């Protein structure tokens, strides 16, 4: 079976660069026997950033890049020359990426906009050269500071798709067929449950060159919030959708009951989904006459807009687009929506075994027994660097 290209979570090890060592050097020139200290400062270690990129839709490009490290700052040198700063590392991620600590599952940050840049790890500051420690009583200081150590962290990047409309329904409810009709997306379509095994995105064209994004996720079954079926892994993608389109086939024994089951599964997974606007589409309605449609309308859930559609014949598709656009653009609909990301249980995620990796040791690695803090415990040092 071919490996899926849809990767919505990865685990990576990140390390910033350590600061370069300050130089302990004295000016030595002919006819200047006491030139004094002229050791330069060490360079700053490289930072590690996350940056949103709308050209990425999955985390596939990071699946096999498990170690991301910025470079170290270079040491200072004579003539008060500062060392070169370490090179930053920027991790490009799709918009909607959420970052968690791989050990505790604690939420760290999220990236939702194209070009948004978030610092994940800060590079170490460069150490001060001995020139900075020259005083009236100490004209020839022989000590300098080592650079600050690097920071390291293993994180989990988890993608939650950003879409205007999310399709919610049982397997074989016609979600993929609808997406293929209203957009240029070509999801796999077949007459059996769980045809869709991964989310699909499509851009729906509307009047006057306007458009909105629609997301199709694998079908939800009763008990999905408890881990049954495929729904649990993909339910998180619904959290980012502005509007939920519930899809129930007209052939269902009880349309209202099926809608309530779907609704309850979402609420069990995340009660905050109750606040999202909802629209109901009764699919596969091409065999219904007006009298039967009128009868079924009497038993539908109250307080939710609905429309009868058929993706095969095109019945109600225009009306559905109008309804979705209307709901998406209602007054106050796009007020700032604050999404609270809960911590995750990292034990529920499966990762391939990490390959053993030996990190390179720098030739100028500091003595491990050297106490770093003793050089940075004075606020005066910080003031000297400004």
Swiss-Prot record:
CDD domains: Obg (cd01898). GO terms for molecular function: GTP binding; GTPase activity; magnesium ion binding. GTP binds at residues 169-176, 194-198, 216-219, 283-286, 310-312. SUPFAM superfamilies: Obg GTP-binding protein N-terminal domain, P-loop containing nucleoside triphosphate hydrolases. Mg(2+) binds at residues 176, 196. Signal peptide: none annotated. Residues 18-44, 357-386 are annotated as: Disordered. GO terms for biological process: ribosome biogenesis. InterPro entries: G_OBG, GTP-bd, GTP-bd_Obg/CgtA, GTP1-OBG_CS, GTP1_OBG_dom, GTP1_OBG_dom_sf, OBG_GTPase, P-loop_NTPase. It is an enzyme of class 3 (hydrolase). Its main location: cytoplasm. PANTHER family: DEVELOPMENTALLY REGULATED GTP-BINDING PROTEIN-RELATED (PTHR11702), MITOCHONDRIAL RIBOSOME-ASSOCIATED GTPASE 2 (PTHR11702:SF31). Monomer. HAMAP family: GTPase_Obg. Belongs to the TRAFAC class OBG-HflX-like GTPase superfamily. OBG GTPase family. An essential GTPase which binds GTP, GDP and possibly (p)ppGpp with moderate affinity, with high nucleotide exchange rates and a fairly low GTP hydrolysis rate. Plays a role in control of the cell cycle, stress response, ribosome biogenesis and in those bacteria that undergo differentiation, in morphogenesis control. This is GTPase Obg. It comes from Parabacteroides distasonis (strain ATCC 8503 / DSM 20701 / CIP 104284 / JCM 5825 / NCTC 11152).
């Amino acid at each position: 079976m071919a490996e899926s290209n849809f990767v919505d979570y990865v685990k990576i090890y990140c390390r910033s660069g350590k600061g370069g060592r300050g130089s302990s050097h004295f000016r030595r020139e002919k006819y200047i026997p006491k030139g004094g200290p002229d050791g330069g400062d060490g360079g700053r270690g490289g930072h590690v950033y996350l940056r949103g990129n709308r050209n990425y839709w999955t985390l596939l490009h990071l699946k096999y890049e498990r170690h991301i490290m910025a470079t170290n700052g270079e040491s200072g040198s004579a003539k008060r020359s500062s060392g070169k700063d370490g090179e930053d590392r920027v991790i490009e991620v799709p918009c909607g990426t959420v970052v968690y600590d791989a050990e505790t599952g604690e939420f760290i940050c999220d990236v939702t906009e194209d070009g948004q840049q978030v610092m994940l790890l800060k590079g170490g500051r460069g150490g001060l050269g001995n020139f900075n420690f020259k005083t009236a009583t100490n004209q020839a200081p022989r000590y300098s500071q080592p650079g600050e150590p690097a920071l390291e962290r293993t994180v989990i990047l988890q993608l939650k798709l950003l879409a205007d409309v999310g399709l919610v329904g049982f397997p074989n409810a016609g979600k993929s067929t609808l997406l293929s009709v209203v957009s240029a997306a070509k999801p796999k379509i077949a007459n059996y449950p769980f045809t869709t095994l991964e989310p699909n995105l499509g851009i729906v064209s509307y009047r006057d060159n306007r458009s909105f994004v629609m997301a199709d996720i694998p079908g939800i079954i009763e008990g999905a919030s408890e881990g049954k079926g495929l729904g649990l892994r993909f339910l998180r993608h619904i959290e980012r959708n502005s509007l939920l389109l519930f899809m129930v086939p007209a052939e269902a024994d009880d349309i209202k009951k099926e809608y309530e089951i779907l609704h309850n599964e979402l609420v069990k997974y995340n009660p905050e989904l109750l606040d999202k606007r909802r629209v109901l589409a009764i699919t596969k309605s091409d065999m219904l006459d007006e009298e039967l449609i009128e009868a079924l309308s009497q038993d539908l859930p109250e307080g939710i807009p609905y429309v009868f559609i058929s993706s095969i014949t095109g019945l109600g598709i225009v009306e559905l687009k109008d309804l979705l656009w209307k709901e998406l653009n209602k007054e106050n609909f796009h007020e700032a929506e604050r999404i609270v990301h809960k911590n995750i249980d990292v034990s529920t995620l499966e990762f391939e075994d990490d390959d053993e990796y030996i990190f390179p040791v720098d030739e100028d690695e500091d003595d491990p027994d050297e106490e770093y803090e003793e050089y940075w415990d004075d606020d005066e040092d910080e003031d000297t660097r400004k």
